[in-house]
């Protein structure tokens, strides 16, 4: 048994306050998008990005109700996407992308009995077309919340700025709020700059720059005892292969559930190690593209991903990035709540699902070895080397399939 490096402590203030989180399938679907615009180097089987987009409904309850107790994080692609700015629509058609949108988030909420007047704010993780939707489908009383630098770096929008990719109608006639990560509500969570949105530790916005000006993620406390958190990633990563495997979450010798088949129990991790660009079981498959592509600053995007890697090392933090379609079939989608994700094992069941996007060099090995009963790479509780008071979850090689992660100390994760 060889130990794996312990992750740095990710300290989150203790709180008994939570928010209800709902993962919304926005019905947006994009295909034929070159993966090289987002990640490098390419891995066999993942040459194009074909993905949907998630939004989130956030509901907060407290003794002092506020306008923002009900919010939506991201909106996916607007249904009438050809009404996006002319320069963007022309570029999409020239590149040969395919975009399909069945409905919009406002309609999804309304069809499930949600009064849109109760939605106090829309939070944009960032201003790209597959996240901004159409805020005009919400009442003008719904505020629009954006990340730092938005007003200076993105405004004015189209059509005032003819080359803009953002419709300025999104914020016209409604309150536009830009988050300040240096203000009174600011703190650090791990290496993220954070903003305690409600002031009670239930919902934090995270500064995660690099992909776009003002990019933000969020950390929602989904249960208080034991503490669990869902990290709403936005586009902090476009594929889970950008933050897995890692020194804290290495590629296991046997992967279960099998990402290549629903009929075999597991498959050997070496199938994917064979196509790993660096043949390193402790390094992510991808880096964000640094050259021409969709990232505003690729180096800064990599720094945000490195912070995500540290958070992902903890089993009570569940990153949900906007385009991770491998979650479908495991997680509950709106109108069902997602707060019980940890007790239901969603992270464990989906951790390596992204490997199913790849084409191993020798898939016949799956049939020969896919039903091996010894599963390695389960979790074990160890004290942090940096601070013995901090309980860390680390990955250990083990033949004990019943060994599970114990619960975290309520003050730390």
Curated annotation (Swiss-Prot):
EC number assigned by the record: 3.1.1.-
Positions bound to Zn(2+) 2: 130-131, 235, 323
Annotated Zn(2+) 1 binding sites: 126, 128, 211, 235
Pathway given in the UniProt record: Xenobiotic degradation
Induction remark: Expression is induced in response to 2-benzoxasolinone (BOA) exposure. Expression is also induced in response to 6-methoxy-2-benzoxazolinone (MBOA) and 2-aminophenol (2-AP) treatment.
GO molecular function term, any single one: metal ion binding
InterPro entries: MBL_superfamily_lactonases, Metallo-B-lactamas, RibonucZ/Hydroxyglut_hydro
Effect of inactivating the gene: Reduces the tolerance to benzoxazolinones but not to aminophenols.
Any one GO biological process: secondary metabolite biosynthetic process
Domain of life: Eukaryota
UniProt entry keywords in alphabetical sequence: Hydrolase, Metal-binding, Zinc
Keyword S-adenosyl-L-methionine on entry: no
Family matches, as CDD domains: metallo-hydrolase-like_MBL-fold (cd07730)
Function: Gamma-lactamase; part of the Fusarium detoxification of benzoxazolinone cluster involved in the degradation of benzoxazolinones produced by the host plant. Maize, wheat, and rye produce the 2 benzoxazinone phytoanticipins 2,4-dihy-droxy-7-methoxy-1,4-benzoxazin-3-one (DIMBOA) and 2,4-dihydroxy-1,4-benzoxazin-3-one (DIBOA) that, due to their inherent instability once released, spontaneously degrade to the more stable corresponding benzoxazolinones, 6-methoxy-2-benzoxazolinone (MBOA) and 2-benzoxazolinone (BOA), respectively.
Family, as annotated: Belongs to the metallo-beta-lactamase superfamily.
PANTHER family: METALLO-BETA-LACTAMASE DOMAIN-CONTAINING PROTEIN, QUORUM-QUENCHING LACTONASE YTNP-RELATED-RELATED
Record protein name field: Gamma-lactamase FDB1
């Amino acid at each position: 048994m060889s130990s794996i490096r312990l992750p740095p402590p990710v300290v989150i203030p203790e709180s008994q306050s939570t928010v209800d989180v709902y993962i919304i399938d926005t019905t947006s679907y994009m295909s034929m998008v070159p993966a090289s615009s987002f990640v490098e180097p390419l891995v066999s089987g993942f040459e194009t990005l074909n993905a949907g987009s998630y939004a989130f409904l956030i509901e907060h309850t407290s003794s002092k109700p506020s306008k923002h107790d009900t919010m939506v994080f991201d909106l996916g692609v607007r249904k009438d996407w050809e009404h996006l700015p002319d320069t963007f629509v022309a570029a999409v058609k020239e590149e040969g992308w395919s975009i399909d949108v069945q409905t919009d988030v406002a309609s999804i909420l309304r069809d499930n009995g949600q009064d849109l007047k109760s939605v106090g704010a829309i939070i944009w993780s960032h201003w790209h077309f597959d996240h901004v939707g159409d805020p005009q489908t919400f009442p003008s009383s719904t505020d629009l919340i954006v990340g730092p630098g938005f007003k200076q770096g993105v405004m004015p929008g189209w059509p005032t700025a003819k080359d803009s990719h953002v419709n300025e109608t999104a914020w016209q006639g409604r309150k536009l709020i830009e988050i300040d990560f240096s203000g009174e509500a600011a703190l650090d969570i791990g290496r993220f700059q954070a903003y305690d949105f409600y002031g009670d530790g239930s919902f934090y916005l995270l500064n995660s720059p690099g992909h776009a000006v003002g990019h933000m993620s969020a950390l929602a406390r989904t249960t208080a005892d034991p503490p669990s958190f869902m990290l709403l990633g936005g586009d902090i990563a476009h594929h889970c292969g950008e933050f897995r495997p890692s020194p804290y979450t290495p590629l296991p010798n046997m992967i279960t559930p099998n990402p290549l088949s629903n009929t075999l129990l597991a498959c050997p991790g070496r199938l994917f190690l064979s196509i790993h660009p660096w043949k390193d079981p402790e390094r992510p498959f991808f880096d964000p593209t640094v050259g021409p592509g969709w990232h505003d600053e690729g180096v800064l995007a990599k720094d945000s991903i490195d912070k995500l890697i540290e958070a992902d090392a903890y089993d009570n933090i569940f990153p949900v990035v906007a385009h991770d379609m491998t979650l479908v079939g495991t997680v509950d989608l709106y109108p069902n709540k997602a707060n019980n994700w940890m007790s239901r094992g969603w992270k464990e069941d989906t951790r390596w699902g992204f490997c199913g996007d790849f084409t191993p060099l020798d898939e016949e090995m799956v049939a020969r070895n896919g039903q091996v009963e010894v599963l390695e790479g389960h979790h074990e509780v160890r004290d942090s080397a940096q601070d013995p008071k901090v309980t860390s979850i680390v990955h250990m090689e083990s033949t004990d399939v019943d060994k599970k992660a114990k619960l975290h100390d309520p003050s730390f994760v």
